[in-house]
Amino acid sequence: MTVGKSSKMLQHIDYRMRCILQDGRIFIGTFKAFDKHMNLILCDCDEFRKIKPKNAKQPEREEKRVLGLVLLRGENLVSMTVEGPPPKDTGIARVPLAGAAGGPGVGRAAGRGVPAGVPIPQAPAGLAGPVRGVGGPSQQVMTPQGRGTVAAAAVAATASIAGAPTQYPPGRGTAPTPVGRATPPPGIMAPPPGMRPPMGPPIGLPPTRGTPIGMPPPGMRPPPPGIRGPPPPGMRPPRP
């Protein structure tokens, strides 16, 4: 239903209205809505009706009933008059306006992650993990570079680690002899690094007299039956 702004019904919205029905009952409530059939909605409504006495000598008495929210049918409505102005809004919480004065706090949006200007906390020196380059490859090897550059850097790092000179205490100009390796006598070449020395007596000592050729030196277990022992020193093993 389209109603103009100058309608009298709209001007009485939220007023206390007195509505009289055909049967004589009176409804007084706050006028909230209506339609084209004059159906009304009243809130905080009270009903007043007159009760006739049984005897003619007794006067009529009026009875009041509290109804609350009421829907009145327009076909039963006889008259409608203003009972009072709209009630004042008391105790209703309203949303504060944007320009209203606020409190001492500052409203900020909840951010995600670490802000750009805040420094990242670091662990103490004693609790931090190993530094890059200590106990592992150097920083040059770990830095992403081209294929050839990475391979060259890795070879250079390995060579620098393998060929680094060892510092010895003063007074000792040569490196100590490795444990478990005997110094060969003059005139005998030592085996190259990584190769086992030949089987037999220790280097620099002649074979013991009384030991037959092909028998293991004292202190070593003989080979199992059916397996020939190692050849004597200075002889090449037979070809299969």
From Swiss-Prot:
Keyword vocabulary terms for this entry: Methylation, Nucleus, Repeat, Ribonucleoprotein, RNA-binding
GO biological process: mRNA splicing, via spliceosome
Biased composition (Pro residues): 183-205, 214-240
Residue ranges, annotated region (Repeat-rich region): 175-236
Residues modified to Dimethylated arginine: 108, 112
Subunit organization: Interacts with TDRD3.
Record-annotated Sm domain positions: 4-86
Note: Encoded on a bicistronic transcript that code for two proteins, SNRPN and SNURF.
Sequence repeat windows: 175-181, 191-196, 216-221, 222-228, 230-236
PROSITE patterns xrefs: SM (PS52002)
Protein name per Swiss-Prot or TrEMBL: Small nuclear ribonucleoprotein-associated protein N
Annotated positions of the Omega-N-methylarginine modification: 108, 112, 147, 172
Modified residues (Asymmetric dimethylarginine): 108, 112
Residue span of region Disordered: 165-240
Top-level taxon of origin: Eukaryota
Compartment list: Nucleus
Family, similarity comment: Belongs to the snRNP SmB/SmN family.
SUPFAM superfamilies: Sm-like ribonucleoproteins
InterPro entries to which the protein is assigned, alphabetical: LSM_dom_sf, Sm, Sm_dom_euk/arc, snRNP-assoc_SmB/SmN
Organism, scientific name: Bos taurus (Bovine)
Primary role: May be involved in tissue-specific alternative RNA processing events.
Entry's Gene Ontology cellular component terms: catalytic step 2 spliceosome; cytoplasm; nucleoplasm; U1 snRNP; U2 snRNP; U2-type prespliceosome; U4 snRNP; U4/U6 x U5 tri-snRNP complex
Keyword Repeat found: yes
Any GO MF annotation of the entry: RNA binding
